[in-house]
Amino acid sequence: MGKYNLILSEYLSFIYNSQSAVQIPIYYSSNSELENRCIEFHSKCLENSKNGLSLKKLFAEYSDVIENATLLSILSYSYDKYNAVERKLVKYAKSKPLEADLTVNELDYENNKITSELFPTAEEYTDSLMDPAILTSLSSNLNAVMFWLEKHENDVAEKLKIYKRRLDLFTIVASTVNKYGVPRHNAKYRYEYEVMKDKPYYLVTWANSSIEMLMSVFSHEDYLIARELIVLSYSNRSTLAKLVSSPMSILVALVDINGTFITNEELELEFSNKYVRAIVPDQTFDELKQMLDNMRKAGLTDIPKMIQDWLVDCSIEKFPLMAKIYSWSFHVGFRKQKMLDAALDQLKTEYTEDVDDEMYREYTMLIRDEVVKMLEEPVKHDDHLLQDSELAGLLSMSSASNGESRQLKFGRKTIFSTKKNMHVMDDMANGRYTPGIIPPVNVNKPIPLGRRDVPGRRTRIIFILPYEYFIAQHAVVEKMLIYAKHTREYAEFYSQSNQLLSYGDVTRFLSNNSMVLYTDVSQWDSSQHNTQPFRKGIIMGLDMLANMTNDARVIQTLNLYKQTQINLMDSYVQIPDGNVIKKIQYGAVASGEKQTKAANSIANLALIKTVLSRISNKYSFATKIIRVDGDDNYAVLQFNTEVTKQMVQDVSNDVRETYARMNAKVKALVSTVGIEIAKRYIAGGKIFFRAGINLLNNEKRGQSTQWDQAAVLYSNYIVNRLRGFETDREFILTKIMQMTSVAITGSLRLFPSERVLTTNSTFKVFDSEDFIIEYGTTDDEVYIQRAFMSLSSQKSGIADEIAASSTFKNYVSRLSEQLLFSKNNIVSRGIALTEKAKLNSYAPISLEKRRAQISALLTMLQKPVTFKSSKITINDILRDIKPFFTVSEAHLSIQYQKFMPTLPDNVQYIIQCIGSRTYQIEDDGSKSAISRLISKYSVYRPSIEELYKVISLHENEIQLYLISLGIPKIDADTYVGSKIYSQDKYRILESYVYNLLSINYGCYQLFDFNSPDLEKLIRIPFKGKIPAVTFILHLYAKLEVINHAIKNGSWISLFCNYPKSEMIKLWKKMWNITSLRSPYTNANFFQD
């Protein structure tokens, strides 16, 4: 077993280093004789430790267990009072503590003052502005660093340099924290007033960020960047990240393109050796100089110097350092402002009458026309989704907050909850459910607010609207998104594309006679000037659409949608300010509606079109592409002459002047070679992503467990690593150890082993090898997987009680009745389960389940109990396949250029050998005929799991299933009797397997699985006609080959001789695969 278990036992002896501490390893085996020895070994260990005897003799006596069995967990005893952190910290606190400059930030509370100066009393205190919001503590983080330092103090050569760099930075953190004492956290990992009152308010979140940064230091440059950010972020809690990352928007315009990848007609990336010169007017250099001056004014020295040095020759070879600075800037932590300041930010923009009405008119008309274009077809054809919009809305209602806490009765149980789904049920039960009336959000019923915190930007507010708004908007927005899915302009929604496709789109048209205009419109989206024209454009579009149909229900859907827009034109918000709740009129657009993303995209597209139509009066150009992606839009303009400095400058100034005429405070830039938007940036013809995910601070608290957060931490580490920000893996593993350990009593703790945390079971947290998802096939691995499956889902008394109440039952049967035309148990049970799952977001239920889960886990980690299960996992399938493959050495040569310079070498190597893919593999079954047939007649959307179940039923059961969902009998008959049905079986199985194998996550999403270079390494003689079996054999082989290449940097070839007799057996097994949800899969999903 790997590195993890080794580090684990070293970590435990580091933490519990007193005489009274004992570590007892617990082993298990699938071999029953050995298993008995494991049990004996364990009980003797307990016996000896109770009597204070050494365990050394036992280790020798039971060497067979230690050598042949698998480590399950380590039990640690310690009667030590836990102030070890402070004692160890003193050793490192050797330098002068940092002193916060209390005048750096504009808002008083953003200065790092002593807590009692900001909050004189415990009543006034709030941790919301500095809450790390993660289920691990500062003391754990300090321990993890000190463990690493102690372990590496005898390193040599290059490793010694890394040690010294980190030691130096940790000295700063240790000295500062030590000056005030380590803040102790409470049971919920929060820092209370008593602990914080005599300490700087931002101490904890700053120390977490600093630890995250210093544990990501490898080179000397890393050290310089980290030191500067650590020192300055102690004082500057507001603008540091913004200052450091601002220059990037200009830097991307300075690098010549010498060879790049472009999207070809087949939507694949293809190398093009074109050369495009960066044409940069002096004005741009002046702006850059201004940015660097601002950085120096804020006390930065090394970082502006690095940028200045790079500017000498602006080479793409040295550009990764610029990318590094850009990524690092986000790791100073989240900027968390008070809600009042966040809201007022939008409202203090001056409202001027001096705007270009003609442009606004054009803008509104473009929005109107786009809305009409998107919805015209569904409206004219009286689409059933628009007819049954209310039901569709209910089925996809989330369990987020509805804005107010209510007292709800479920049977005999009375609970308080804010959750939408519970409010809907309660309203239905009490005759208060009126989806036809959209509640006003005016001064009488102001909107409660949520928040969104992001590093380097101001806090943004989010509307928490009543659920009626969701129901009214859901169906219409879904139709808009379907339109956007096949419209290239909407980069974010375009069908199954990933960011590589958008990259090739931009580079495609770059040449010496074109320029690209890129604009960050986030300020515009939330500005007051946008709100009237924006809502009016949508309303006008809806009015036009209402005249295209005679169907009363479609008209009603459109009218309700229109009503949400009318209500929101007169919106007030409620903001807690101290003890009072302030009501203010809020005239801007905020997130929180279902339409936010779609409507913003429409508006941003209309905006750039408006601007371009103005510019075209003065210049002659062809617009090659227009794209909008979230808060950004960009366009490539092709002129009929070669671009000159003067032209770039003129176009740039005219574009800015045009935006200014609409009073839009946006950042518009023009370049000939690159762009920078929130999601990605292109420089020198290569694509970069910001590696800015914080590891030790979180944006907000949810109801996830420590295990979930450990998995998210690992997942974040992987994403950052793929994007060029690497944190020490040993440190990440140490954090996982801390976060997955389970306390039994005050002095007893259980630490799961690597096998438990990496086997794909319901408890999986990380991969034993980065980027490689292993599916264990050895006896012990399958044994432990089975053991964990036996305790997968935990019951909750509260949830059962709610589900048994008439309120809940009536709601579920009401949904079923509206949806189904005849009895359909699969769907009814599915709805009931979905609704019951939504209850998990109610804290008491998730707590109850967590407790049950932990007690089951404790039993399991001390002695695994297996059960004979008929359930088959993907591991079983792969285990059956594996023996029939023979491996031989092979060779693939590098044949593609690099286009994503930040990738780790081993991942880069694979892309250079087999190529990349620009599309997401379909893994939800939505492309299958049955899925399309259902969505043609019903608002119900079956999951891939459900489709997988249904498609393997008998033909008459499939017919009944379809008919119950309202599909006409003739269509159902035709479907079952056709070839399409057998194609579907294969297609859905394929989707399901792709889904199970996480093929669209991690680094697998970058590889071209259909690469001919990969195919030629695999030889599988074609026997019998079972496409599903051939598919799984090929996919398994491809994953084996790729995993081997990631691990070893070399290629193997696989030959498979699969007996015909086994094929049918395998095929039958393939229809019974159980999918496993784990913290690990949730974290993958969470990345999405």
Swiss-Prot record:
Alphabetical list of InterPro entries matching this protein: DNA/RNA_pol_sf, RNA-dir_pol_4-hel_dom, RNA-dir_pol_luteovirus, RNA-dir_pol_reovirus, Rotavirus_VP1_C
The enzyme's E.C. designation: 2.7.7.48
PROSITE patterns: RDRP_DSRNA_REO
GO biological process annotation, one example: viral genome replication
GO MF annotations, alphabetized: nucleotide binding; RNA binding; RNA-directed RNA polymerase activity
Family per similarity comment: Belongs to the reoviridae RNA-directed RNA polymerase family.
Name used for this protein in its record: RNA-directed RNA polymerase
